Design a protein with these regions (language model features):
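Short beta-strand-centered aromatic/proline hotspots
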Residues: 22-28
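Glycine-centered tight beta-turn/hairpin loop motif at sheet-sheet or coil-to-beta transitions
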Residues: 19, 39-41
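Intrinsically disordered, low-complexity, charged/polar segments
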Residues: 42-59
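SH3/SH3-like beta-barrel fold
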Residues: 34-38
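Mixed-charge, Lys/Arg-rich low-complexity intrinsically disordered regions
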Residues: 1-12, 20
Length: 59
């Protein structure tokens, strides 16, 4: 079972291992899965337990 997400819709993030994706805006965060709309990669679902997204702006 996962706790509450650290991410909220509207936050701007970047993926630490995929800088070419550009910045992304968090769309939703449910059950440890964060849906992010990245500038170059489009919509990507990220597993919070496996990837430490970097917060750039709190929206």
């Amino acid at each position: 079972m996962t706790g509450p997400s650290l991410f909220e819709p509207g936050m701007i993030v970047k993926h630490p291992n995929q800088p070419e994706w550009g910045l992304g805006q968090v769309q939703s965060a449910v059950g440890g899965k964060v849906t992010v709309n990245f500038q170059e990669a489009g919509k990507v679902v990220v597993d919070e337990a496996r990837v430490g997204l970097v917060v750039v702006s709190y929206g």
